[in-house]
Structures are given as C-alpha cells and as structure tokens.
Amino acid sequence: MCLAIPVRIEELLDEQSAVACIGGLRKTINVALLDDLKVGDYVILHVGFALQKLDEAEARRTLALLAELGQLAEAEQAAQGDAS
C-alpha cells in the first residue's frame, strides 16, 4: 500500500528540488510538478514527489489523524503482546 502524506517545505534548493520536513526528518524531495512554492508551504508527498499544495490547516489535521492512527496501532500491538 502506498500513502501520500503532507510535508512542510523547509528549503528550496532549485526549480526541481526542495528539502521537506517529514516526521522530524529532513529529506530532499522532487517539486518539479508544482509552481510557486515557498518555504513554509505544505505539499502532498508521494514516493518522493510533491504532487500538490495543501492548505496548512488541512495538512495539520491530516498529520494529527496519522499520529492518532500510529498510536492506535502501537496500542493494538501492545495488547497483542499482553495476550501472549
């Protein structure tokens, strides 16, 4: 399964690449598909490519939901470990 996630642009390197913050990590991504990007913009990232700009509020909501899902998965794994 592939997942596209919101990321924040931290630095523009050139017309085709930028540095994005992904879960606290900085990674170079391809931004060739988008115009008029600025530092601080949020984009949807899929397999290393920024696909579209995203409103900051929507990006934050999505990131919060993903964090919640991660916590749920951790709790389920812990519960399965306790059942053994």
From Swiss-Prot:
Organism: Azotobacter chroococcum mcd 1
Pfam (any one): HupF_HypC
Coiled-coil ranges per UniProt: none
Protein purpose: Involved in the maturation of [NiFe] hydrogenases. Involved in the biosynthesis of the Fe(CN)(2)CO cofactor.
Molecular functions (GO terms): carbon dioxide binding; iron ion binding
Pathway: Protein modification; [NiFe] hydrogenase maturation
One Gene Ontology biological process: protein maturation
Gene3D superfamilies (alphabetical): 2.30.30.140
Designated name of the protein: Hydrogenase maturation factor HypC
Record-linked InterPro entries: Hydgase_assmbl_chp_CS (IPR019812), Hydrogenase_HupF/HypC (IPR001109)
Family from the record: Belongs to the HupF/HypC family.
UniProt cross-references to NCBIfam families, sorted A to Z: hypC_hupF
High-level lineage: Bacteria, Pseudomonadati, Pseudomonadota, Gammaproteobacteria, Pseudomonadales
